Amino acid sequence: MTHWFHRNPLKATAPVSFNLYGVASSPAANKICNDLRTARARLLDMFTDATCSPDTLKKSSDEYFALLQGFILPLDGTTQENKLRFIQNFKWTDTLQGNIASAQQDAVFELVSMAFNVALWYTKFASRLAGKENITEEEAKDVHKSLKIAAGIFKTLKETHIPRLITPAEKGRDLEPRVIDTYIVQSQAEAQEVTIARAIELKHNASLIAALAFETANFYQKADHTLNTLDPECSSKWKKYLQLKQHFYMAYAHCYHGQTLLAGDKCGEAIRSLQEAEKCYSRAEVLCKEYRQMKGPGSTAKPSEQLFFKKLGAVIKNTLEKCQRENGFIYFHKVPAEAPALELKASYGLAEPTAFELPPLSAQCTPEVYATFDLTRGHKDDKAKAKPEEEIKPVKEPDLKPQKDTGCVVC
């Protein structure tokens, strides 16, 4: 299922040397700075390595975050701010704002920006894995797991770490509530797509599939509405993707709800539900075409070309024809003018974000070593402090090569 998911670009960043000449006045302090520089560069390389696994990325990110916390957590036995928190300047782009970077001299800004990229990597890993030919059950579980991990990272950043920033996020930037909320909800919705595909593959109860599809459609609608007040120039393409997914899963919900109604001998209502499914599916097809033509940040998904998308159209058509035949021979029910309300609540299969925790502080960052960082000796960046509007070269991400579509998203 290559090109099933829309993905915004990774955040780009300027190099950071951590050369605290004069301030780092001991070999142990200098080693922390050198290790920070090396760990950061290694982690950034992981983001663009198509062979990188979740375990490898976690090991690399844990190494960096364990060291970086030595610039954030109090290490002098008091509750006062870490004296190193504001000593180094960091520059990051945003996923919707092109190559113009934001700059803050704050280690917490670095923490949330890098962790944001880690979450983005998990969504991209899930997308690549879902695009494999003949994906296995274990790989499907990895897709599901990765999307929940991403949602958990975004959620923890929003609730715990972003509020600590001295300088609040500007409108339209990744760290402001509307943008990060959308990433949280989209990751959850896509994880539930895995569950739906699995439920269909195993021929689970139609009512369960309908409820899951309805909940997933509502997630996509919520994500779309969250972006309503964002600048259309940077958000319209993303919104169109969320809208097409919403209508696609509403079509699923009405289709499988129709099957449930037919099984309960409510043939007239089943027909009306299937007609509504046809309407939602047609709208999803139109939105797919509009999405493909839109310009904006991110890769362009091609859901309408996938067998998973096309199969739903055939299922709706065949089920509706079956209902109409049964109604003509057996039930003779009147078809209601209004579609049956989808008052569905999924009891199983809902994707909750996986809790995200930072690794423990590195053993290198002791109070004794911390005391050898001497701010009175002054510090100047080895380059002039960044201007907020400085352009940074975008991240060159690995190409997503199309593979033969088996018609099964993740199962």
Swiss-Prot record:
InterPro entries: BRO1_dom, BRO1_sf, BROX
Primary localization: membrane
Pfam families xref list: BRO1 (PF03097)
Swiss-Prot/TrEMBL keywords: Lipoprotein, Membrane, Methylation, Prenylation
Taxonomic superkingdom: Eukaryota
S-farnesyl cysteine: lipidated positions: C408
Membrane topology according to the record: Lipid-anchor
Propeptide intervals in chain numbering: 409-411
Span list, region Disordered: 379-411
Cellular component GO terms, alphabetical: membrane
Domain BRO1 positions: 84-403
Family: Belongs to the BROX family.
Entry protein name: BRO1 domain-containing protein BROX
Organism: Danio rerio
